Amino acid sequence: MRPLIIAHRGASHLAPENTLTAFRLAKTLGADGFECDVQITRDRHLVVAHDYLTDLKTGVHGNIPDMDFDDLRQLDFGKWKSPEFAGEKIPTLEEVLKSHRTSG
């Protein structure tokens, strides 16, 4: 019996953590599953992000529970990792689950 490989926040060593790109890459690399962090926005959307504060990952000050989803979706959650990930948006929990389910 082999151990299960669970990708922490997706393939976060190669792509911005908790993004659709990171979760897809984890699957491509053979991870058996992943873990993610979920926050709730002011207008009750479930989004996937580790930190409540947006500062570190976007360079824009904000607190996810105090923000509306549409405002969060305008922020870039990828360029902090590398310019190649610029434009990466915060995913909803539903998007992450659908992406994982339909990717194989």
Regions found by a protein language model. Give the residues of each.
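Phosphate-group recognition and catalysis centered on beta-loop-alpha active-site segments
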Residues: 1-104
